[in-house]
Structures are given as C-alpha cells and as structure tokens.
C-alpha cells in the first residue's frame, strides 16, 4: 500500500541521488560508486531512522509492539537516519579506499534537496508541528489524528470546527524546516566551486542544519524526548552539531 508520505520520501531520495551522481560526474568521480554508496546509505538510514524513533518513543511502542513494524504511517527520526546513513557511507568509503570527506562534500547538496522534499511528507502524515497559531498558513489537523499528549491547552482553547470535525491550528514546523533545507541547498550549490578543503561543504551542512533545527525544535510540540526528561533529543544533537562544526568552519576559512 502506497502512501503520500512514502511517495514524497521516495521522490526526495531519487532526486537527491540524481543530483549526487551529476555532481560526481562534474568532479570527475565514478558515478557508479556514488550511486552504490547512496543506495546502501539510504537503506541503512531508513532502518536507522525507524530504530531511533522507536527507541525514543518506547513508552508507546512497548505497549504496541505490532506498531513497530508498521512503516506506512510515519514514525521516522531524521537524525537517526543521518547518523546511520553517514556511518554506512564512512564504512563504504573505507572499504573502497576513497575519501569520505570528498564524498560527503559531493553528496550533501543532494541530501539537502531530498530533505527539503521529504519534509512535505510530514504534512500529509500530520507530523512535525508546533504550538497554536492563527497565521494564514497555519496547519490544520483533526484532533482525533493527534496523540492527546501532543495537544496543548492553547490548541484546545482555539479549536476550529468544520463540518462537525474539530481541528487544531498549529505552526507548520515541517514547512519552516523544508525552506531552511532549501536555503542551505542553494548556499552549498553556490559554494561548491569555492571550497577550500575537503569536508568544508559537509561541515557547513551539519552546522547549518543543526542551527536551523535547534530553533525549530523549540517550537515543535511532537518532539522526541530523552527518556526521563523533558529535553528534546533533536535539540541536544542540533546544539552539538552547531557547537562542534561551526567553529571549525570559521577557523579553517580564516
């Protein structure tokens, strides 16, 4: 059974891989090697993103074990996918005796393009939203489609009823992140001929995405938390990415 969520993820992945192979050709690299690397990394990242999501949503899944294998309705964590995917790419580069940093520089614009497109899957899956808003571009979601713990008091106080169905009106965090990824994509495409060292584009990607995601996570209400705390795991990872890689980018640029 196909879902719009799955279709958008697939479209983003295909366009991203297409761009990576074109960039590989432009750099005089073996396109087939990059295609192999991306396919392997994609498969590993899908599994990793699911495992990451389940691990940090264990309170729900331990009572609904069958839901762990329900891959049709979302339940994927991007950072889990990136972590597992980059690890797979690093292993692939080591086996093929090629530079991971060079490969990552070539791949990251395609990854960002895929992220920008794939985030729209969250719209159709009613995920990645923030607090109540009455802005014209507010995301409207049926209350029945949202877990009760993700519906705040402000959302309940401002329900919108259409044809007898109650909707919450919330910030479309997925949209903001999609636009941020598109902006970073354009930045990296503009810089790819001006980079000073291997790994520069990749580190800009990590620092830039971490910066944007850090702010978006503050407003997101359906975030994943570190067990036993009210601290979002993506918030922590985003802060680490920015704090580690942005100084390196600045210092090596100077």
Region annotations inferred by a language model:
Residues 1-254:
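A feature for loop-to-transmembrane-helix boundaries and adjacent hydrophobic helices
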């Amino acid at each position: 059974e196909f879902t719009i969520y799955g279709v958008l993820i697939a479209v983003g992945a295909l366009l991203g891989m297409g761009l990576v192979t074109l960039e590989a050709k432009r750099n005089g690299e073996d396109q087939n090697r990059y295609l192999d690397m991306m396919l392997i990394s994609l498969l590993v990242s899908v599994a990793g993103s699911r495992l990451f999501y389940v691990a940090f949503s264990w309170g729900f899944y331990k009572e609904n074990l069958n839901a762990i294998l329900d891959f049709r309705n979302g339940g994927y964590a991007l950072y889990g996918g990136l972590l597992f995917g980059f690890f797979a790419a690093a292993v692939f580069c080591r086996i093929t005796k090629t530079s991971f940093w060079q490969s990552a520089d070539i791949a990251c614009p395609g990854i960002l393009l895929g992220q920008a497109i794939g985030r729209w899957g969250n719209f159709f899956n009613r995920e990645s939203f923030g607090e109540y808003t009455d802005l014209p571009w507010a995301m409207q979601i049926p209350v029945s489609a949202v877990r009760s713990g993700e519906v705040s008091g402000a959302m309940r106080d401002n329900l919108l009823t259409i044809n007898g169905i109650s909707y919450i009106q919330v910030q479309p965090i997925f949209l903001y992140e999609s636009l941020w990824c598109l902006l970073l994509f354009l930045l990296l495409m503009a810089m790819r001929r001006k980079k000073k060292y291997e790994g520069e584009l990749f580190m800009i990607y990590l620092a830039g995405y971490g910066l944007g995601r850090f702010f978006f996570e503050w407003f997101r209400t359906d975030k994943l938390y570190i067990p036993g705390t009210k601290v979002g795991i993506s918030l922590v990872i985003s802060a680490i990415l920015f704090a580690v890689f942005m100084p390196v980018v600045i210092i090596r640029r100077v």
